[in-house]
């Protein structure tokens, strides 16, 4: 039995598919560039760290605009606010050292992960959301580990930077899985 997605779901799935491919590509490029400068906290590494949640803001804005026909974008607005706060927090923490950056990054990963998990659960019927649900849950765990790593003897940015790579993989898988939903109508 073949089911056909409602026009709103199909349109949203196509928009999310494009967004998820773009997010995967950005995350991989960002991780590669940021790994190259993550051995110490400099103006460049801080700027790169601030850029990541700002891209999350832009993606959430695009997501909210494309998702209006399939449900309330309230959680996406929460994600926008949280990611903006994270960007500001990272800019400030950059002058305080790696432990402060890891605490802000960790707190952001926990809250953004919870939002991603809940958004994924609410979009389950659209298809392609299991990677987002899993990724959201893993973000909560990763964020907790970043927060804990801030208290280590020699905390490093590389684990926080590495956080982008599994995220990119999950976005890529979700984009591929959303292809079926986008084509059903």
Question: In which residue ranges do the predicted regions lie?
Answer:
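N-terminal topogenic module of multi-pass integral membrane proteins
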Residues: 1-70, 179-185
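Structural signal for membrane-spanning alpha-helices in multi-pass inner-membrane proteins
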Residues: 31-34, 60-63, 90, 116, ...
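Membrane-water interface at the C-terminal end of transmembrane alpha helices
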Residues: 118-127, 146-152, 167-184
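Alpha-helical membrane segments in multi-pass integral membrane proteins
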Residues: 104-115, 129-146, 160-170
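Core segments of transmembrane alpha-helices
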Residues: 23-30, 79-87, 135-140
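Hydrophobic alpha-helical transmembrane segments in multi-pass integral membrane proteins
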Residues: 31, 86-96, 139-156
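Structural signature of hydrophobic alpha-helical transmembrane segments
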Residues: 40-54, 95-110, 161-166
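Membrane-proximal helix-loop-helix units in multi-pass membrane proteins
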Residues: 85-134
